[in-house]
């Protein structure tokens, strides 16, 4: 499970599709097209489209390039004790 930060709230992420949708929303909120984001990180627009529409086949390398270009980070939490507060505390400990 992964928490994403969206509009002052945390969202639990349970699937690659949810993750891709959350990252697509961030891209759109920043006013970037798929082409603009792809150019920013040196990949093809089709690669961004494939990630947003079929994230199961995206390599981890591509995923992290997109994540970094969107100025996002990822925090892993113990699913049994997951909460926004736990995620923030874990982030503070690093």
Curated annotation (Swiss-Prot):
Keywords: DNA-binding, Repressor, Toxin-antitoxin system, Transcription, Transcription regulation
Residue ranges the UniProt entry marks as DNA-binding: 34-53
Protein's UniProt keywords contain Transcription: yes
Keyword Repressor: yes
Protein's job: Antitoxin component of a type II type II toxin-antitoxin (TA) system. Neutralizes the toxic effect of cognate toxin HipA. Represses the hipBA operon promoter.
Source organism (scientific name): Escherichia coli O6:H1 (strain CFT073 / ATCC 700928 / UPEC)
Pfam families reported in the protein's UniProt record: HTH_3 (PF01381)
PROSITE patterns reported in the protein's UniProt record: HTH_CROC1 (PS50943)
Entries under SMART domains matching the protein: HTH_XRE
A molecular function (GO) term: DNA binding
Annotated knockout phenotype: Deletion of the hipB-hipA operon has no effect on virulence in mouse infection; the disrupted strain is as virulent as wild-type.
Quaternary structure, from the entry: Homodimer. Forms a HipA(2)HipB(2) heterotetramer which can interact with DNA. This complex also blocks the toxic activity of HipA.
Protein name: Antitoxin HipB
Signal peptide: none
Domain HTH cro/C1-type intervals: 23-77
CDD domains (UniProt xref): HTH_XRE
InterPro entries: Cro/C1-type_HTH (IPR001387), Lambda_DNA-bd_dom_sf (IPR010982)
NCBIfam families: PRK09726.1
């Amino acid at each position: 499970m992964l928490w994403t930060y969206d509009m002052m709230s945390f969202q639990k992420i349970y699937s690659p599709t949810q993750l891709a949708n959350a990252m697509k929303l961030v891209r759109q909120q920043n006013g970037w097209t798929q082409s603009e984001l792809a150019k920013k990180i040196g990949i093809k627009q089709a690669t961004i489209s494939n990630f947003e529409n079929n994230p199961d086949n995206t390599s981890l390398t591509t995923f992290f390039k997109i994540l970094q270009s969107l100025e996002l980070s990822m925090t892993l939490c113990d699913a049994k004790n997951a909460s926004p507060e736990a995620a923030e505390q874990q982030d503070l400990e690093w």
